[in-house]
Amino acid sequence: MLAVSEDGKLVVAGSDSHGTAYGILEISRLLGVSPWEWWADVTPEKKETFRLSGKFRELQSPSVEYRGIFINDEDWGLMPWSNKTYEPSDVKGEIGPRTNERIFELLLRLRANTYWPAMHECTLPFFLTKAIGKQRKSMASLWELPTANQWRAMLPENGKYVEKEHTIT
């Protein structure tokens, strides 16, 4: 919920951490910031002022349960760009933490709640990347997980996708 209170204060509230984040990011949308601002080089138009009417109230809820991004065909696009250009790494097939942070930001801006990470054999599986600890904890607190401390992920194993359980520490 995004509303202007009787005393003129902007109120942002959500039913959970997602809803609150979406409410905060709705302000950026009202200001003209595209969810794709970083990925598509969409520079927001500068505004001198921004006002909401005293009666402004917006209440939104999702129309589908799972909304997210599935990283696919990363072997020719995302992974080499991340690994060689955006955050060079000696770890073969790694999509690094800075790239994942940008993906998570996009997910929030798009009001998503689900992330299906890259899973081709050439890519280091998301949950096996070195610098993922902070992101795991962030995801555990923000993204809906099957249980409080477990995430089921599909990992490439001998050319087949195998469901494995990972404990978030």
Task: Spell out what each predicted region is.
Residues 2-168:
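Feature activates predominantly on carbohydrate-active enzymes
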